[in-house]
From Swiss-Prot:
Gene Ontology cellular-component terms listed: cytosol
Organism: Lactobacillus acidophilus (strain ATCC 700396 / NCK56 / N2 / NCFM)
Domain EngB-type G: residue ranges: 22-196
UniProt xrefs under InterPro entries: G_ENGB_dom, GTP-bd, GTP-bd_ribosome_bio_YsxC, P-loop_NTPase, Small_GTP-bd
Protein name stated in the entry: Probable GTP-binding protein EngB
Gene name tied to this protein: engB
Role according to the record: Necessary for normal cell division and for the maintenance of normal septation.
MF terms in GO: GTP binding; metal ion binding
Binding site for Mg(2+): S37, T59
Cofactor: Mg(2+)
């Protein structure tokens, strides 16, 4: 996928605030601090388009990024951040649920999982929920530069077991925003989904 242009479009917490142009959308979901913003910046070759933070829980809205005037990448608030109140967590959950269930132009969901840790209950719930909704899924193991090369197979085996992955239906990629590992494959998956 060749990136010609990319820009922040809008932040939304409800359907009335979503873009109205019916362009296809690819959403990114994952735990707080898993690397969603870094993945967006790396993929779009922009240093600070999506704000990165070492402090978890910074993204609190659905952030839409217009790419090539052709489709949107949608950064979803991170889940599993303990320092957010129960009420706020519930609001995030409802916002994400409404988006995933009602958005007809959602063409795929990229679920990011930190390669240094096993998938959490929240990761598993998000994966199963997306499957239930029949949303095409790409699972991305982030921060691969932080683990030793000889640990890759162990990480992938653990992920496959924990999520009960069937590779016929779900694509899995390892990824690093530092080394740019699998950026091309990520772009190809997105291109395939938005063209369907």
């Amino acid at each position: 996928m060749i990136i010609k242009s990319s820009e922040y479009a809008v932040s939304a917490v409800k359907e009335e605030q979503y873009p109205k142009d019916n362009l296809p959308e690819i959403a990114l979901a994952g735990r707080s601090n898993v690397g969603k913003s870094s993945l967006i910046n790396t993929l779009l070759k922009r240093k600070n388009l999506a704000r990165t933070s070492s402090q978890p829980g910074k993204t609190q809205t659905l952030n839409f990024y217009l790419v090539n005037d052709d489709f949107y990448l949608v950064d979803v608030p991170g889940y599993g951040y303990a320092k957010v109140s129960q009420k706020r967590r519930q609001e995030f959950g409802e916002m994400i649920q409404d988006y995933l269930e009602t958005r007809p132009n959602l063409k795929g969901l990229i679920i990011l999982i930190d390669s240094r840790h096993e998938p959490t209950k929240d990761d598993i719930s998000m994966y199963e929920y997306a499957q239930y909704l029949n949303i095409p899924i790409l699972v991305v193991c982030t921060k691969m530069d932080k683990i030793k090369k000889n640990q890759t197979n162990k990480v992938m085996t653990g992920l496959r077991k924990k999520l009960d992955l069937n590779y016929d239906h779900v694509t899995v990629l390892t990824f690093s925003s530092v080394t740019k590992f699998h950026v091309t494959e990520l772009g190809n998956w997105i291109e395939d989904k938005i063209s369907q």
